[in-house]
């Protein structure tokens, strides 16, 4: 019972983590461009 639940949690966390990293990198890139760095 625990393994499928853990597998589902991991499958749910991976895309959220990737999207979070992408958004953070995009915001940092935009902020850097605004400051001319």
UniProtKB/Swiss-Prot annotation:
<comment type="similarity">
    <text>Belongs to the PetG family.</text>
</comment>
<keyword id="KW-0812">Transmembrane</keyword>
<dbReference type="InterPro" id="IPR003683">
    <property type="entry name" value="Cyt_6/f_cplx_su5"/>
</dbReference>
<keyword id="KW-0813">Transport</keyword>
<dbReference type="GO" id="GO:0009512">
    <property type="term" value="C:cytochrome b6f complex"/>
</dbReference>
<keyword id="KW-0150">Chloroplast</keyword>
<keyword id="KW-1133">Transmembrane helix</keyword>
<keyword id="KW-0602">Photosynthesis</keyword>
<dbReference type="GO" id="GO:0009535">
    <property type="term" value="C:chloroplast thylakoid membrane"/>
</dbReference>
<keyword id="KW-0793">Thylakoid</keyword>
<keyword id="KW-0472">Membrane</keyword>
<dbReference type="GO" id="GO:0017004">
    <property type="term" value="P:cytochrome complex assembly"/>
</dbReference>
<dbReference type="GO" id="GO:0045158">
    <property type="term" value="F:electron transporter, transferring electrons within cytochrome b6/f complex of photosystem II activity"/>
</dbReference>
<protein>
    <recommendedName>
        <fullName>Cytochrome b6-f complex subunit 5</fullName>
    </recommendedName>
</protein>
<comment type="subunit">
    <text>The 4 large subunits of the cytochrome b6-f complex are cytochrome b6, subunit IV (17 kDa polypeptide, PetD), cytochrome f and the Rieske protein, while the 4 small subunits are PetG, PetL, PetM and PetN. The complex functions as a dimer.</text>
</comment>
<dbReference type="InterPro" id="IPR036099">
    <property type="entry name" value="Cyt_6/f_cplx_su5_sf"/>
</dbReference>
<keyword id="KW-0934">Plastid</keyword>
<dbReference type="Pfam" id="PF02529">
    <property type="entry name" value="PetG"/>
</dbReference>
<dbReference type="GO" id="GO:0015979">
    <property type="term" value="P:photosynthesis"/>
</dbReference>
<keyword id="KW-0249">Electron transport</keyword>
<comment type="function">
    <text>Component of the cytochrome b6-f complex, which mediates electron transfer between photosystem II (PSII) and photosystem I (PSI), cyclic electron flow around PSI, and state transitions. PetG is required for either the stability or assembly of the cytochrome b6-f complex.</text>
</comment>
<feature type="transmembrane region" description="Helical">
    <location>
        <begin position="5"/>
        <end position="25"/>
    </location>
</feature>
């Amino acid at each position: 019972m625990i393994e499928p639940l853990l597998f589902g949690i991991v499958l749910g966390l991976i895309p959220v983590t990737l999207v979070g990293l992408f958004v953070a990198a995009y915001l940092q890139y935009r902020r850097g461009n605004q400051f001319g760095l």
